[in-house]
């Protein structure tokens, strides 16, 4: 954080919480989750393969050897401790994969589709009707959109679930190059033009992200009660 935001980052606020406390809470939650996942893995007999163990050892060596002597002293850490930490994370990942391997995470290409649109937005029906008339008379979408949106066209990349439903339905029903009729959504009026009805590489990336979300939602649904049943005590002297 300091490398990106500077040393003053810890006095800033995140979601109404001091940054230092926010980061500690996030790390604490992550550590508790990993420890509980390792306990569950032990109960279920989940272990690392030889290949995984070798990869963990190699990664720990690489990480430790990249630390300066000053960093090693400041962290007060040994290579064995790094390898133990990496091993726990690898076991947690293995448990996660095992638990989520049997669920259906299929996402259709249409549900994952990412499109690019331009739109004209107006606060009144009369204004958007005026814009529609100009388009119907052959004026370019760019020219009309510029008058309603400032110096540049209003252009955006869209995924399902990000917009008002009426806007989304109209936008995703368009083919490349098509323009919608007047759409009312969220108390405003729009005319939408589709510049790409499928950004294929971004659609594939979004499909992967949606599948990962499904896995995480499922894992949380089955693991949170287990985690809540465990008593975890932090070493306050070390933690603070």
Language model region names:
Residues 156-157:
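Short helix-loop boundary/capping segments
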Residues 36, 127, 140:
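Residue-level recognition of oxygen-bearing side chains
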Residues 71-133, 146, 162-240:
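PPIase-associated folding chaperone regions across multiple families
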Residues 141-150:
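Short, well-ordered alpha-helical segments enriched in acidic and aromatic residues
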């Amino acid at each position: 954080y300091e490398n990106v935001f500077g040393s003053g980052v810890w006095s800033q606020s995140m979601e109404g919480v001091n940054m230092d406390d926010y980061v500690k809470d996030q790390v604490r939650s992550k550590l508790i989750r990993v420890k509980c996942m390792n306990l569950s893995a032990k109960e279920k007999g989940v272990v690392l393969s030889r290949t995984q163990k070798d990869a963990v050892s190699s990664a720990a060596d690489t990480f430790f050897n990249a630390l300066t002597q000053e960093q090693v002293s400041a962290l007060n850490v040994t290579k064995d401790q790094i390898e133990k930490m990496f091993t726990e994370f690898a076991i947690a990942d293995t448990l996660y994969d095992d638990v989520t391997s049997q669920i259906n995470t299929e996402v259709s290409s249409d549900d994952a589709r990412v499109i690019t649109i331009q739109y004209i937005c107006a606060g009144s029906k009369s204004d958007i009707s005026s814009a529609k008339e100009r388009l119907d008379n052959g004026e370019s979408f760019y020219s009309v959109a510029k008058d309603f949106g400032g110096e540049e066209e209003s252009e955006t990349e869209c995924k399902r679930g990000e917009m008002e439903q009426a806007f989304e339905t109209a936008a995703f029903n368009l083919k490349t190059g098509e323009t919608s009729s007047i759409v009312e959504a969220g108390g405003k009026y729009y005319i939408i033009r589709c510049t790409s009805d499928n950004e294929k590489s971004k659609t594939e990336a979004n499909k992967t992200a949606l599948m990962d979300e499904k896995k995480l939602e499922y894992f949380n649904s089955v693991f949170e009660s287990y985690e809540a049943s465990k008593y975890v005590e932090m070493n306050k002297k070390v933690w603070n």
